[in-house]
Regions:
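Short active-site oxyanion
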Residues: 1-2, 31-34, 65-68, 103-108
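Active-site neighborhoods of divalent-metal-dependent phosphate/nucleic-acid chemistry enzymes
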Residues: 68-118, 123-125
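Short, well-structured N-terminal submotif of metal-dependent ribonuclease cores
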Residues: 1-36, 49-59, 124-125, 131, ...
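Fold-independent oxyanion-binding glycine-rich loops
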Residues: 8, 38-39, 112-113
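Buried hydrophobic packing segments
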Residues: 11, 44-48, 98-99
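A generic structural signal for short hydrophobic patches within well-formed alpha-helices
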Residues: 11-12, 41, 116-117
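Active-site-proximal, substrate-binding regions of enzyme catalytic domains
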Residues: 21, 38-82
Length: 137
């Protein structure tokens, strides 16, 4: 089914089971590959450490090993600094610029962060939220 760009909100659902986890796992099993920005390493590790559970940290490592990490290049950082909408948060802008750097026509962004999803769509990317039935306000 092509590759998917998965942001930290999606990756963390693979670490700690939530309502969308089963649907997300089923979707990802059909993908040819998964990519994310290397900033996801920091985001996921910080979340795991906040949880204070060694098993969560170990699961975080396993999840991150299953994803190809895109480096933070000068081109990605420059693009992130100029992306619209201007209100997009900095880490989301880096995720978005990283996704836009992938030369894969059929790639979809998987995120459970509605602001990130809106920004991705505004920049021409297709967004999926497996297991999410209704948009949260």
């Amino acid at each position: 089914m092509g590759i998917a760009y998965v942001d930290s909100s999606a990756l963390l659902k693979l670490v700690v089971s939530e309502g969308e986890t089963a649907a997300l796992e089923a979707d990802l099993a059909t993908r040819d590959g998964l990519v994310t920005s290397s900033i996801a390493v920091v985001e996921c590790h910080r979340a795991a450490r906040r949880a204070g559970d060694r098993r969560i940290l170990q699961r975080t490592e396993l999840v991150l090993e299953s994803v190809y990490l895109l480096g933070l290049t000068a081109v990605v950082l420059e693009r992130a600094s100029t992306l619209r909408p201007v209100g997009i948060r900095s880490l989301d802008a880096i995720h978005l610029a990283s996704a836009l750097s992938v030369d894969e026509r059929d790639m979809e962004v998987i995120t459970y962060d509605d602001r990130m999803a809106d920004a991705a769509r505004a920049n021409g990317l297709r967004v999926q939220q497996p297991g999410r039935t209704a948009r949260r306000a």
